[in-house]
Amino acid sequence: MAAEPNSTPDGPLWVVIAAYNEERRLGETLKRLSPYCGNIVVVDDGSHDRTSEVALAHPVWVLRHVVNRGQGAALQTGIDFALRQGAGVIVTFDADGQHCPEEIAQLVEPIRAGRADVVLGSRFLGRAVGMPLSRRVVLRLGVLFTRVFSSVRVTDAHNGFRALSRRAALCIRITQDRMAHASEILDQIRLHRLRYCEVPVTVRYTEETLAKGQSSWNALKIVGQLLLGRLIR
C-alpha cells in the first residue's frame, strides 16, 4: 500500500475525476490511483457507456450528470461534493490514465507546506511521453494566450493534473462547462490573488488518448469561448 500524502489542517485529500465514455480506461486508472488516495469521487458526465458501472466496482464515490455538460461542469460538481465532505486539498485527475498517481504527493506538497493555494502540474517542466509536435504547438499557443489575457505566467496552461487548497476551491467557480475551464481557472487565480506554483509531472500519450483529446480546431473554439466570456462578464 502506497503512502497517502499528508492532509492539511483544513481536512483530508480528495481526488476528483471527470469521466465521459471512459469504460475502457477508467477501471485501470482507479486501480492505479486508489493506493494513493482513499477519497475519490468520479463524476460520470452523461456517458452512454458503462462508465458508472466501472466506477462503482471500485471503492469510490460516483456522481452522474443526466446529460453531458462538459469537463468543466463535471469538475465543479466533483469539487463541490468534495468540499461538502470536508476536503482540505482537492486534486483533479484525468480519467484516461495519462497522469501518474505516484506524483500526487509532490503535487500537494506546496499546499501542505503552506507555500501555495494552487499547484499546477506541468508536462513541460516534467515529461510528455509520446506527445506529437502538433499537440506541443497547440499547447504552447495556449500558454501564450494565457499570458496575454490572464497575466498568469505558467509553462503549461491546459494540464488537468492540479491541486487546490480548500480556500482556493471555495474561491474558484468554474462557469465554462467545457474545455475552456482550464484557462478560466488560471484567470480566477489572478482575480482572487491566489498563490500558485508549478511542479514537474508526467503526461503519457497513447493513440487512444490522442484520438479523444483536443484537436487544433477545438483549441480555437476554446479561445472563442473565453473571449465571449470576457465580453459578457
Question: What are these language model-derived features?
Answer:
Residues 44-52, 97:
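A conserved acidic beta->alpha catalytic loop
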Residues 61-84, 101-179, 205-228:
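Acceptor/aglycone-binding surface of glycosyltransferases and processive sugar-polymer synthases
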